UniProtKB/Swiss-Prot annotation:
It comes from Stenotrophomonas maltophilia (strain K279a). The active site is at 117 (pros-phosphohistidine intermediate). The gene is ndk. Belongs to the NDK family. GO terms for cellular component: cytoplasm. This is Nucleoside diphosphate kinase.
Length: 141
């Protein structure tokens, strides 16, 4: 087992539903610890920068618009195999395909408004965490 960190973003749709606490409880039950967190309204520049890898994809503009449509809750999570553990909690990107009991099955509205983001690899997690948090803001516990 490897101790890892991953980035998690509770997206505007889930924040609007007031389910941040319910989602955090799932993280904790799965053994993931919040080691950094911030609640904020993303600027267009922040959203475009974060999702720059998708810039040429047809859904890029809609994704950016959605991510700036309301506040988000951003957290770095730490735990054994955190990337996979978090992605398992999230479920499939399309909530219609997500297993019952996953965050997206329970809280997401559509493939676009899918409740949460999760890093897809340890390498990307490090990049994504550094995008939103200074090293001094991430504290193991």
């Amino acid at each position: 087992m490897a101790l890892e960190r991953t980035l998690s973003i509770i997206k505007p749709d889930a924040v609007a539903k007031n389910v941040i606490g319910e989602i955090y409880a799932r993280f904790e039950k799965a053994g993931l610890k919040v080691v950094a967190a911030k609640y904020k309204q993303l600027s267009r520049r922040e959203a475009e920068g974060f999702y720059a890898v998708h810039r040429e994809r047809p859904f890029f503009n809609a994704l950016v618009e959605f991510m700036i449509s309301g506040p988000v809750m951003i957290q770095a999570l730490e735990g054994e195999n955190a990337v996979l553990a978090h992605r398992d909690l999230l479920g499939a990107t399309n909530p219609k395909e997500a297993a019952p009991g996953t965050i997206r099955a329970d809280f997401a509205e559509s493939i676009d408004a899918n409740a949460a983001h999760g890093s897809d690899s340890v390498e990307n997690a490090a990049i994504e965490i550094a995008y939103f948090f200074a090293a001094t803001e991430v504290v193991s516990r």
